[in-house]
């Protein structure tokens, strides 16, 4: 492959992403960024991302077990294990943030700040920095007390109404074989980051992006939600 063709196939080459996400939604987003050529550095706890232990697990030649989620969502990334509760770990993480183009995290709202890692302060130091937070309901600023509630993708699928829309004849929601809310949220985060990068090219300014899993699922249900508001039961349409 020629250099010019390779560059075209990797439009994000040279973009440094520091990735504090875990499990599925965030790692899927950063996997898409890595596929587009970004240099993604995945920051994991000392025991590793919990996705490393999610089934299905495959046995490697050395006898160790490796998760399908770990392989499928982390190809092409670099990884480092850091104890962010230690002063040394915190200082290392802040140094990494200060040299990044994009920082993305999926901790509970406010968790990084409790560790002494302030993404808002990082953006004041470097106004071009793009920061992204993924959570179930969003930040305290946008979701209020709901931000304190923790949960998994299945809650977003239920509260958005998407699970109900796919109920079976008995009215029960389906058992999803694909982590739909996680993957959709990762895709929404990816598109928001790329859009923010385009805005930065024009203005020189970065921004903070607040991604709420429930809201990404509500966006998928837009047609049904609007339809329910305009439906006239007395004059149903064919």
Regions flagged by a language model, labelled:
Residues 2-7, 62-124:
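A structured beta-alpha segment of the ubiquitous adenosine-cofactor-binding alpha/beta core
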Residues 9-48, 55:
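Conserved small-residue-rich beta-alpha loop and adjacent elements
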Residues 14-15, 99-102, 127-130:
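Loop/turn elements at helix/coil->beta-strand transitions in domains of secreted/extracellular proteins
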Residues 17, 33, 77, 104, ...:
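Structural scaffold positions in well-ordered secondary structure
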Residues 38-79:
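Glycine-rich phosphate-binding loop and adjoining beta1-alpha1-beta2 segment
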Residues 41, 80, 130-132, 209:
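Hydrophobic/aromatic beta-strand patches that form the interior of the parallel beta-sheet core
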Residues 48, 61, 149, 157-238:
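Acidic, glycine-rich segments within the central catalytic cores of soluble metabolic enzymes
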Residues 86, 105-164:
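N-terminal Rossmann-like NAD(P) cofactor-binding subdomain of oxidoreductases
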């Amino acid at each position: 492959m020629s250099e010019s063709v390779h560059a075209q196939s990797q439009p994000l080459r040279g973009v440094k992403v520091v990735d504090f996400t875990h499990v599925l939604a965030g790692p899927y987003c950063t996997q898409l960024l890595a596929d587009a050529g970004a240099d993604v550095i995945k920051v994991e706890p000392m025991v590793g991302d919990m996705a490393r232990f999610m089934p299905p697990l495959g046995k490697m030649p050395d006898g160790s077990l490796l998760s399908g989620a770990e392989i499928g969502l982390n190809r092409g990334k670099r990884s480092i294990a850091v104890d962010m509760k230690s002063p040394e770990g915190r200082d290392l993480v802040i140094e990494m943030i200060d040299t990044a183009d994009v920082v993305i995290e999926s901790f509970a709202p406010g968790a990084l700040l409790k560790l002494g890692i302030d993404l808002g302060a990082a953006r004041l130091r470097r106004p071009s920095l793009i920061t992204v937070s993924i959570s179930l309901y969003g930040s305290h600023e946008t979701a209020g007390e709901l931000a304190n509630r923790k949960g998994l993708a299945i809650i977003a699928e239920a509260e958005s109404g998407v699970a109900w829309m796919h109920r079976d004849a008995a009215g029960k929601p389906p058992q999803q074989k694909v982590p739909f809310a996680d993957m959709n949220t990762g895709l929404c985060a990816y598109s928001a980051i790329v859009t923010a990068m385009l805005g930065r090219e024009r203005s020189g300014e970065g921004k903070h992006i607040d991604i709420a899993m429930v809201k990404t699922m509500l966006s998928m249900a837009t047609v049904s939600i609007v339809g329910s508001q305009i439906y006239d039961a007395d004059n149903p349409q064919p």
